[in-house]
Amino acid sequence: MARKSLIQREKKRQRLEQKYHLIRRSSKKEIKKVPSLSEKMEIHGKLQSPPRNSAPTRLHRRCFSTGRPRATYRDFGLSGHILREMLHACLLPGATRSSW
């Protein structure tokens, strides 16, 4: 189980990313439209003004059950060992575990 502080930090990053998403998107569109380099540099400076943790690349996908940051399956939102346990217990409808 991940520490609660790390999970809360990740939630804070998600909130910040949602808050500054439109500002980042509009700044990137402006950079594409402006022909001169000096104006692009000004807009780029504006793009760097939001907090660092509001960047979407800072987000990390975590297991919603344990908070584990690695080996998380996108389709289920679970880490590998929790997914395996849930498949053995038949808690995920429609999913079958391959065995040979």
Curated annotation (Swiss-Prot):
Can the keyword Plastid be found in this entry's annotation?
yes
Could you tell me one molecular function GO term of this UniProt entry? structural constituent of ribosome
Q: Where is the signal peptide?
A: none
> Where does it reside?
Plastid, Chloroplast
User: Which GO cellular component terms are attached?
Assistant: chloroplast; small ribosomal subunit
**GO biological process terms on file:** translation
Xref: SUPFAM superfamilies:
Glucocorticoid receptor-like (DNA-binding domain)
Keywords per UniProt: Chloroplast, Plastid, Ribonucleoprotein, Ribosomal protein, RNA-binding, rRNA-binding
* InterPro entries per the UniProt record, alphabetical: Ribosomal_uS14 (IPR001209), Ribosomal_uS14_bac/plastid (IPR023036), Ribosomal_uS14_CS (IPR018271)
Q: Where is this region: Disordered?
A: 28-59
Q: Where is the composition biased (Basic and acidic residues)?
A: 28-45
The answer to whether the entry has keyword rRNA-binding is: yes
Matching NCBIfam families = PRK08881.1
Subunit composition and interactions: Part of the 30S ribosomal subunit.
Q: What does this protein do?
A: Binds 16S rRNA, required for the assembly of 30S particles.
Q: Which family does it belong to?
A: Belongs to the universal ribosomal protein uS14 family.
Name of the protein in question: Small ribosomal subunit protein uS14c
Task: Report the source organism.
Answer: Nandina domestica
Q: Name the gene for this chain.
A: rps14
